[in-house]
C-alpha cells in the first residue's frame, strides 16, 4: 500500500482517524464563577403579587411577543431589517 492511499477501514469508518489525533492542551486560564449576590433571596408568589399591585411602574412597549403553551414559551420579534425571529423554549 502506498503512503498516499487511505486505508480501507478509514474510508469505511472515518471516525477511526480521530484515534490518532493529538490531545488538546489544557487551557491556562480557567474562567471563574460569578460571585453570588449576598442579599438575593427567593420571593414567594404572594410577595410578587403584592409588589405588582403597589407598583406604579408601567412596562415600556417592546417589540417582543411572548406566548406560553403547556410546557413551552415562545418569544417572537422582528429585526430592524424585517427578519422574523422565533425562539421556543421547551420546559
From Swiss-Prot:
It comes from the Viruses. Keywords: Early protein, Host cytoplasm, Host G2/M cell cycle arrest by virus, Host nucleus, Host-virus interaction, Modulation of host cell cycle by virus, Phosphoprotein. Residues 20-64 are annotated as: Disordered. InterPro entries: Papilloma_E4. One of its GO terms (cellular component) is host cell cytoplasm. Contributes to multiple aspects of the viral life cycle including viral genome amplification, suppression of suprabasal cell differentiation and egress of newly formed virions. Induces host cell cycle arrest at the G2 phase by associating with and preventing the nuclear entry of host CDK1/cyclin B1 complexes. Inhibits cellular DNA replication by preventing loading of host replication licensing proteins MCM2 and MCM7 onto chromatin. Within the cytoplasm, associates with host kinase SRPK1, a splicing factor regulator, and inhibits its activity. This is Protein E4. The lineage of its organism: Viruses, Monodnaviria, Shotokuvirae, Cossaviricota, Papovaviricetes. The gene is E4.
